């Protein structure tokens, strides 16, 4: 008898098939899961081909590469990381994140627009997450009910579907293009209206700027239109909760790094922010600071009520504590060291701009 056959036998000599084990040991919602998504499956095939000497090209890259094919690493970041004190390398970080990191990451997300937004009565806060994916997960887990649908653009990053499934929600989509304009306003308005008929909360993940996988970025006019549509939907449905989540994972390499900060600043100055509308940013240091494996991100939240922002922090922290416990301290300290030192910041900026031009 083969070892695997012996291992599959129970104490009474019963031989179990994989199908029987899955049916017995795994609840239905778990048995349908697969660990490797399409991206990582093809990455494994590329690595096998390369190792065997074949002339293979990696088309699955979720990171920045030099023209030589080597991983792009910002030397200012890697040097600063290695300079951190033992405490920063080994100690836990506070569950919400290091205080100076939480302040800094809001500026990284919104730029000069942040102070304007805050000046006009919009309160902001941020919490650390393990990469941008952690922020996406937190929003899906807490801003929709199980069984609800999340609104995405038709063409989107594949793992959005994985995160949605893990949170027990489905997906709805609106077009990536609007014909002669960037935004299909009619389709977006219609989809929001339909979702509000079916559920009490609406959450949309909008990957902009530098949309993955197309690289497209909305213009300032298109951003204003999209924000206006969400604000109108909230105003017209005061008993529904509306959240626009801006996934800015690649914002550092777009032409308008802080375009959404500028758009929100204009909105805060000129318009009434509905109390039932939340705007959130998903920040990721994976690309902006080439810290792919350090898993450093943040969820930034904007709302006109300070007490509600504080409540959101507590809600999101509960999810983080019960899912990944806490996020790493070292990358938070590294980013703060870079952005609080003029020479390091300028060096980081030069390298980021070089990578942007590749």
What are these model-derived regions, one by one?
Residues 3-7, 13-14, 104, 269-356:
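Conserved core segment of the aminotransferase class I/II
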Residues 3-5, 11-18, 23, 29-130:
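N-terminal small-domain helix-loop-helix segment of the aminotransferase-like
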Residues 38-45, 134-139, 189-190, 282:
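Short alpha-helical segments and helix-capping/turn motifs at coil-helix boundaries
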Residues 57-59, 151, 172, 245, ...:
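Hydrophobic/aromatic beta-strand patches that form the interior of the parallel beta-sheet core
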Residues 61, 174-178, 284, 329:
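Active-site donor-binding loop signature of nucleotide-sugar glycosyltransferases
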Residues 62-66, 70, 157-158, 209-212, ...:
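Short, solvent-exposed loop/turn segments at secondary-structure junctions
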Residues 69-74, 256-258, 293-295:
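Short aromatic-enriched loop/helix-cap "lid" or pocket-rim segments at secondary-structure transitions
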Residues 85-244, 251-273:
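Conserved core of the PLP fold type I
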């Amino acid at each position: 008898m083969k070892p695997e056959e012996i291992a599959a036998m129970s104490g009474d000599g019963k031989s179990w098939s994989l199908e029987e084990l899955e049916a017995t040991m795994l609840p239905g919602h778990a048995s349908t899961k697969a660990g490797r998504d399409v991206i990582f499956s093809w990455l494994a095939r590329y690595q096998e081909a390369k190792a065997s000497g074949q002339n293979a090209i990696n088309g699955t890259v979720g990171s920045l590469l030099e023209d030589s094919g080597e991983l792009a690493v910002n030397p200012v970041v890697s040097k600063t990381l290695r300079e951190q004190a033992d405490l920063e390398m080994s100690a836990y970080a506070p569950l919400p994140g290091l205080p100076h990191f939480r302040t800094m990451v809001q500026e990284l997300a919104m730029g000069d627009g942040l102070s304007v937004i805050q000046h006009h009565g919009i309160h902001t806060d941020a919490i650390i997450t393990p990469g941008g994916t952690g922020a996406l997960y937190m929003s899906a887990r807490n801003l929709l009910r199980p069984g609800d649908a999340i609104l995405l653009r038709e063409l989107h990053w594949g793992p959005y579907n994985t995160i949605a499934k893990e949170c027990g929600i489905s997906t709805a989509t609106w077009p990536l293009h609007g014909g002669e304009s960037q935004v299909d306003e009619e389709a977006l308005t219609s989809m929001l209206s339909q979702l509000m008929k079916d559920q009490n909360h609406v959450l949309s993940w909008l990957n902009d700027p530098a949309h993955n996988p197309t690289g497209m970025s909305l213009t300032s006019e298109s951003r204003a239109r999209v924000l206006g549509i969400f604000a109108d939907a909230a105003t017209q449905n005061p008993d529904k909760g509306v959240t626009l989540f801006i996934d800015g994972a690649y914002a550092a390499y777009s032409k308008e790094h802080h375009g959404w900060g500028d758009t929100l600043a204009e909105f805060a100055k000129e318009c009434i922010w509905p109390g039932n509308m939340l705007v959130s940013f998903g920040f990721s240091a994976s690309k902006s600071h080439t810290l792919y494996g350090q898993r450093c991100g943040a969820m930034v939240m904007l709302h006109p009520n300070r007490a509600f922002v504080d409540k959101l922090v507590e809600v999101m922290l509960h999810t983080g504590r019960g899912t990944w416990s806490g996020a790493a301290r070292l990358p938070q300290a590294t980013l703060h060291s870079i952005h609080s030192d003029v020479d390091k910041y300028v060096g980081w900026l030069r390298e980021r701009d070089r990578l942007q031009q590749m």
